[in-house]
Amino acid sequence: MRSSRNVTALFGQGYRNFLDLLYPRRCPLCHRILRNSHQLICPDCAGDLRPVSGPRCYKCGKPVNGDEEYCRDCSAHPGAFDQGRGIFLYDDRMRYSIMKYKYFGCQEYSRFYGKALYIYGKDLLAVWKPQIIIPVPLHRRKQRIRGFNQAELLAKELSQLCRDSCRYCYSKKVPCYPITEKTGCG
């Protein structure tokens, strides 16, 4: 029995190595191939990460001055959600990375972003103590176009790290326009 487990483990490792060779993991910020398949980000880009710190908007989590409760955007246009948190400053590199993740099929970025959510959100997770993690649903038409729902993949990664369950309780019946189309940003 023991030797069959070893053979299975060896086969599994060989299969993962083959997949790494065929589809190498890439850095989510610079998109270069990572030397080590266990890395989630290259060392150069790891030093460039800029986590959000200090006072934040109570609504969206963007950095604000110490005496402000809400950022300019949330003061002008309250969103349809109660509270959100970003973990990194949304600069050009982060915007490019998220665009590659969502629209160009870079599903492997889920491991990096899930782990980053866990590491940089540990304090908030300790306060919230979630029992389940529910991803934001994606309309089936958008999911067909993208091939996956990034919120679902992030929820799975985060729930594994938190040892919580990830449930899919909702489905989106009505398609909506991307935020960039609503605001004219992009």
Residue ranges and their predicted role:
Residues 1-186:
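Glycine-rich phosphate/pyrophosphate-handling loop used in enzymes and phosphotransfer proteins
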